[in-house]
Amino acid sequence: MSSTFSFDVVSKLDMQEFDNALNQAKKELQQRYDLKNTNSSIEFNQKDMQLTLESADEFSLKSVVDIIESKMIKRGISIKSLDFGKVEPASQKSVRQKISLKEGIDKENAKKITNAVKDMKLKVQASVQGEEVRISGKSKDELQTVMSALKEMDLPVPLQFTNYR
């Protein structure tokens, strides 16, 4: 019986954990003494998957970004899923920064993953399926080797492995 095994390489954001991290960041923002009179705020547009940060100056905006990053790391969310926009001036001498959330593996990174799998010279196949990459092969050991190699790759998107069969 020659059965094949496979797994999917995906880049998904756990929205529940992200929401928890965001709520913790908002709570800390209200309690921090150094950010008291800076009118700093964090707003999340769920439809556009975009964070909007506002603060009195760039220094306090950097502190808000640090708060968000630390809360995300504590909740186990990779900060690679954040795409930082430029810091732009807003009303009344304040500054604003938009941060987009990235989900899914784009074609360029999917191609890098498939090429890396082919360069390993293992008996596995990689195929791009929309925003995920399916790796299949006859040996579970080879699939685990591919998994560990992909974890060590430095890609601009966080990777998760699902549908291991």
Swiss-Prot record:
Keyword terms, alphabetized? Nucleotide-binding
> What InterPro entries does this protein's entry cite?
DUF520, UPF0234-like_C, UPF0234_N, YajQ-like_sf
Tell me which domain of life the UniProt entry assigns to the organism this sequence originates from: Bacteria
Question: Record's Gene Ontology CC terms?
Answer: cytosol
| Pfam families named in the record | DUF520
Q: Which GO terms describe its molecular function?
A: nucleotide binding
On whether Nucleotide-binding is a keyword of this UniProt record, the answer is yes
Disulfide bridges in this chain? none
UniProt xrefs under NCBIfam families:
PRK05412.1
Family named by the database record: Belongs to the YajQ family.
Q: HAMAP family, alphabetically?
A: YajQ (MF_00632)
Q: What is this protein called?
A: Nucleotide-binding protein Ctha_0558
Q: What is the lineage of its organism?
A: Bacteria, Pseudomonadati, Chlorobiota, Chlorobiia, Chlorobiales
